[in-house]
Amino acid sequence: MALICISPILIVVTIWLHFANKGAGAFFFQERPGKDGKIFKVIKFKSMTDERDADGNLLPDAQRLTKIGRFVRSTSIDELPQFINVLKGDMSLIGPRPLTPVYLKVFNERQARRHEVRPGITGWAQVHGRNHCKLSKKFEYDVWYVDHCSLIVDIKILWMTVINVLYRKDIGEGAGDMQDIDDLGFTPRILEIERKEREQNAK
């Protein structure tokens, strides 16, 4: 029902982004771990072009972010295609936000509990700081939700999400600077894991 209601918005934004992204497409697909760590492809609206420099390297994000892309991010419209993930059963409306698979390799046992439920479009951490929330606190919020999820909690999260979107509270143009919110020291470990994976794939 929700997907049917938002379908006019999806169609308009898809056409809008198709032209704004200069042929780079309107959708962005990325692998994310879901319930029990099962990998699925999350769908979002693509807010950047694929423009590259003379050497073939992608230009900085700030240069590739379009005006329309900035708008869909600041209004959280870029998240709407994830209702398709909900329809497919990969995600839920409410739950911990899905991160990239590399986090599975750095989580401790307690942090990994966030995967005991399906990831959500919005969640307890999103209505308590979103991109400005420190990682340690974000994961504590996620585990709290796992232990306390209920219809009443979900309704509360939905209501708080609507308020946050309307007042654009804790909503930015993109994810916060990871080094600003990473109080767990995950960033260097993740970068090292990704470097080794690139080297392995290059062989």
Sequence positions of predicted segments:
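Soluble extracytoplasmic domains of inner/organellar membrane proteins
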Residues: 127, 132, 147-149, 159-160
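A hydrophobic, helix-centered structural microdomain
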Residues: 1-50, 157-203
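Positions in alpha-helical segments
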Residues: 14, 28, 66-70, 102, ...
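Compositionally biased, charge-rich terminal segments
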Residues: 136-152, 174
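Short, hydrophobic secondary-structure boundary micro-motifs
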Residues: 13, 27-28, 57, 94-96, ...
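Short, glycine-rich, amphipathic interfacial segments at transmembrane boundaries or analogous
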Residues: 25-64, 122-140
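Generic recognition of short, well-ordered alpha-helical interface segments
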Residues: 7, 40, 63, 78, ...
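A short, structured surface patch at a secondary-structure boundary
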Residues: 61-118, 161, 165
